[in-house]
Amino acid sequence: MKHNNVIPNGHFKKHWQNYVKTWFNQPARKTRRRIARQKKAVKIFPRPTSGPLRPVVHGQTLKYNMKVRTGKGFTLEELKAAGIPKKLAPTIGIAVDHRRKNRSLEGLQTNVQRLKTYKTKLVIFPRRARKVKAGDSTPEELANATQVQGDYLPIVREKPTMELVKLTSEMKSFKAFDKIRLERTNKRHAGARAKRAAEAEKEEKK
């Protein structure tokens, strides 16, 4: 070794050049995927290209639970509230997830409204062209129907308006992370503290 150069420390195998991963097929793969998408769109016509309608859900864990995204499927409760039978839903392009549970009224109402909006825009083709059943769309609607490309009923993330206020010394001294930790600790010990307080009250009465 001489001069101020990097000390070589490459941990290579003896014939490492024979095992280098190449990506020469990348442009062709891109073309192949595009053609496959076009073929699928033709095959599933007149259904939307992006698949069935999915619900709006909140992400899991403390990091993501403030963000909304599309979920796997609508709950049976949501379908019932929107007046859609659970057996019919998958046949008209609505994803169903029997395992998911509604944990808030707001979430339930949002998805019920989403389903109702979808129903108003839905065009149902008859299974057999000559046998039109109840619930199928009119011939005029069928003639004007087009295949939806890309996302439909996209999630609109509203940005809250910011209100500018003057900084006070109290605001500057406030430690948000410490406050969150304190409140989380209080929540964790709430049951034990309540029990201890009840026992102390019982002792005083004696």
UniProtKB/Swiss-Prot annotation:
<dbReference type="GO" id="GO:0003729">
    <property type="term" value="F:mRNA binding"/>
</dbReference>
<comment type="similarity">
    <text>Belongs to the eukaryotic ribosomal protein eL13 family.</text>
</comment>
<keyword id="KW-0689">Ribosomal protein</keyword>
<feature type="region of interest" description="Disordered">
    <location>
        <begin position="185"/>
        <end position="206"/>
    </location>
</feature>
<dbReference type="GO" id="GO:0003735">
    <property type="term" value="F:structural constituent of ribosome"/>
</dbReference>
<dbReference type="Pfam" id="PF01294">
    <property type="entry name" value="Ribosomal_L13e"/>
</dbReference>
<dbReference type="GO" id="GO:0006412">
    <property type="term" value="P:translation"/>
</dbReference>
<dbReference type="GO" id="GO:0000325">
    <property type="term" value="C:plant-type vacuole"/>
</dbReference>
<feature type="compositionally biased region" description="Basic residues">
    <location>
        <begin position="186"/>
        <end position="195"/>
    </location>
</feature>
<keyword id="KW-0963">Cytoplasm</keyword>
<feature type="compositionally biased region" description="Basic and acidic residues">
    <location>
        <begin position="196"/>
        <end position="206"/>
    </location>
</feature>
<dbReference type="InterPro" id="IPR001380">
    <property type="entry name" value="Ribosomal_eL13"/>
</dbReference>
<keyword id="KW-0687">Ribonucleoprotein</keyword>
<dbReference type="InterPro" id="IPR018256">
    <property type="entry name" value="Ribosomal_eL13_CS"/>
</dbReference>
<dbReference type="GO" id="GO:0005730">
    <property type="term" value="C:nucleolus"/>
</dbReference>
<dbReference type="GO" id="GO:0022626">
    <property type="term" value="C:cytosolic ribosome"/>
</dbReference>
<dbReference type="GO" id="GO:0009506">
    <property type="term" value="C:plasmodesma"/>
</dbReference>
<protein>
    <recommendedName>
        <fullName>Large ribosomal subunit protein eL13z</fullName>
    </recommendedName>
</protein>
<dbReference type="GO" id="GO:0022625">
    <property type="term" value="C:cytosolic large ribosomal subunit"/>
</dbReference>
<dbReference type="GO" id="GO:0009505">
    <property type="term" value="C:plant-type cell wall"/>
</dbReference>
<dbReference type="GO" id="GO:0005829">
    <property type="term" value="C:cytosol"/>
</dbReference>
